[in-house]
Swiss-Prot record:
GO BP terms, alphabetized: L-histidine biosynthetic process; L-tryptophan biosynthetic process
InterPro entries: Aldolase_TIM, His_biosynth, HisA_bact_arch, Isoase_HisA-like, Isoase_HisA-like_bact, RibuloseP-bd_barrel
E.C. number(s) listed in UniProt: 5.3.1.16
Pfam families given in the database record: His_biosynth (PF00977)
Signal peptide, first to last residue: none
Record keywords: Amino-acid biosynthesis, Cytoplasm, Histidine biosynthesis, Isomerase
Gene that this polypeptide is encoded by: hisA
Localization (cell): Cytoplasm
Name under which the protein is recorded: 1-(5-phosphoribosyl)-5-[(5-phosphoribosylamino)methylideneamino] imidazole-4-carboxamide isomerase
């Protein structure tokens, strides 16, 4: 399973929100580039960036910061937030971003998602952010009547590369991921699902690892990495590629039970 550190950018700084509430913001670092370098140095194989300002206004805001991160690290980067038209997505991918994450546009203009998938195969991910099972849009400020599973099925048919599922009520709370919702979503679609929201411990990651065989292939971790609840190195050893439980017993005992 791929452990993906999250870097949320608001006003040029690295922050975390509580349940997606912009009024409940905690600043963790004034320089997101330094944060990206840290996670890369600690063994991250991919980074998850969100331009929170762009998610609200629907157009890029922290583009210079994102460009600086791309130049600073040599690992794949996925970026979301405010990607609602062709030129924005195309310019972002042209910078060297591996995958663009679409949110609001998946609800409002699914035909545009189809167009993106045809033009940029393998590079389009849809982020499904759910509140009580229904999809939230526009930086989580609005909630639609569309069920998360229904949207996932529709997006899978359009051939998006993966689905990122976030339970908004869990996001930033360290209360653990919504395992049942993830199980339902992963069972419904045949494309990879990436878990996000509430992950607080190695045990949470091990619970997600149990869903890997049905399609949960990654976990985005935010607040727990910043508060020290999860060590990226230990997380990779526990559930990442070449994890300890995959090592033959005769090569030594694991520190993880």
């Amino acid at each position: 399973m791929n452990i993906i550190p999250a870097i949320d950018i608001l006003g040029g700084r690295c922050v975390r929100l509580y349940q997606g509430d912009y009024k409940q913001t905690q600043i963790f670092n004034d320089n997101p580039v330094d944060v990206a370098k840290r996670w890369a140095d600690e063994g991250a194989t991919k980074l998850h960036l969100v331009d929170l300002d762009a998610a609200k206004v629907g157009q890029p805001v922290n583009q210079k910061t994102i460009e600086a991160i791309i130049k600073a690290v040599d690992i794949p980067i996925q970026v979301g937030g405010g990607l609602r038209n062709y030129s924005t997505v195309a310019s972002l991918l042209a910078l060297g971003v591996q995958q663009a994450i679409l949110g609001t546009v998946a609800i409002e203009q699914p035909e545009l998602v189809s167009d993106f998938c045809q033009k940029f195969p393998g590079q389009i991910i849809v982020g499904i952010d759910a509140r009580d099972g229904k999809v939230a849009t526009k930086g989580w400020l609005e909630t639609s009547q569309v069920l998360a599973t229904d949207l996932a099925l529709q997006m899978a048919k359009l051939k998006v590369a993966a689905i990122i599922y976030t339970d908004i009520h869990r996001d930033g709370t360290l209360k653990g991921p919504n395992i049942e919702a993830l199980r339902e979503l992963a069972t419904a679609v045949s494309i990879p699902v990436i878990a996000s929201g509430g992950i607080s411990s190695i045990n949470d990651l091990l619970n997600l690892l149990a869903l890997e065989t049905i399609g949960v292939k990654g976990a985005i971790v935010g607040r727990a990495l910043y508060t020290g609840g999860i060590s990226l190195k230990e997380a990779n050893q526990a559930v990442g590629q070449g994890r300890w439980q995959d090592v033959p017993p005769n090569l030594g005992s694991s520190t993880f039970v």
